[in-house]
A protein has these predicted regions:
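NAD(P)H-binding glycine-rich loop region in Rossmannoid oxidoreductase-like domains
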Residues: 30-71
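SDR active-site strand-loop-helix element
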Residues: 9, 49-53, 91-97, 146-151
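Alpha-helical substrate-binding/gating segment
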Residues: 151-154, 172-193, 200-224
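Short loop/helix-cap segments at secondary-structure boundaries that form the rim of catalytic
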Residues: 15-22
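Cofactor-binding loops of NAD(P)H-dependent oxidoreductases
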Residues: 26-30, 189
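Conserved glycine-rich Rossmann-like NAD(P)H-binding loop of the short-chain dehydrogenase/reductase
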Residues: 4-13
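Catalytic helix-loop patch of NAD(P)-dependent Rossmann-fold dehydrogenases
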Residues: 63-78, 85, 90, 99-145, ...
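Conserved active-site region of classical short-chain dehydrogenase/reductase
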Residues: 34, 73-81, 206-209, 213
Length: 224
């Protein structure tokens, strides 16, 4: 697609109906299966990684920071070391707007906005961003990090959609409540907004996919 041949690696393929739709899909559970990447990289002549794997619940990261540092940081370190070993020099990393914390202006304007994460989840993303800079300087691994806000939406053709267990995302929960005629609870009434409720920025998953393709092209052209 778009000149690229994607190969999917997931730790639990059998419970992921979305992944099962594709042909080149492999089940790998880090760290014990990381050696399996050797054959995949060589078989497909892979020269770039797109890493979207992470634990993402802010609340859980506060309750269980060890779980988040182990999965989001240590596992990423192992992946970078494997890239170094296999001479894979390009990676796109899914970071998060959580690295910003609470900006003094109340709005994140650009990449010069201060980075002050206020929870372990945000800290793990910022740590990996710093790791990527170090691996670029020392080993020539080039990277682009996207600081996503709230990813949402589904494939316009209806082939893939949101898939969380348990579901915690607001849009699918609202849709579910509407279809099942259930009440929907919206929490928070003391934010500095016109009605006191939280305002969030959303980015559609197809826009994310398009951005990742453009990022791959930039890496291929050695622009980043």
């Amino acid at each position: 697609r778009n000149g690229y041949t994607p190969v999917i690696v997931d730790r639990n393929i059998k419970d992921n109906p979305i992944a099962q739709q594709f042909n080149d899909v492999y089940e790998i559970n880090l760290p014990k299966d990381i050696h399996l990447l050797d054959d995949i990289v060589k078989r497909y002549n892979i020269d770039s990684f797109i890493c979207t794997a992470a634990y993402t619940s802010v609340g859980e990261s506060v309750r269980e920071p060890n779980k988040y540092y182990q999965n989001n940081v240590v596992m990423m370190l192992q992946l970078l070391n494997k890239m170094k070993e296999l001479n894979v020099k390009k990676i796109i990393f899914s970071s998060s707007a959580a690295v910003y914390g609470i900006p003094e202006t109340g709005i994140c304007y650009d990449d010069q906005t201060g980075l002050e994460p206020i929870n372990p989840y945000g800290q793990t993303k910022l740590i990996v961003e710093k790791m990527l800079k170090d691996y670029n300087r020392a080993y020539g691994i080039n990277s682009i990090s996207f600081r996503y806000f709230n990813a949402a939406g589904a494939d316009p053709e209806g082939e893939i959609g949101e898939l969380h267990d348990p579901e915690t995302h607001i849009i699918p929960l609202i849709i579910k409540a509407g279809f099942q005629a259930q009440d929907f609870s919206l929490f928070g009434n003391d934010y500095d907004t016109p009605d006191g409720t939280c305002i969030r920025d959303y980015v559609h998953v197809t826009d994310i996919a398009d951005a990742q393709i453009q990022a791959l092209k930039l890496l291929d052209e050695n622009i980043c």
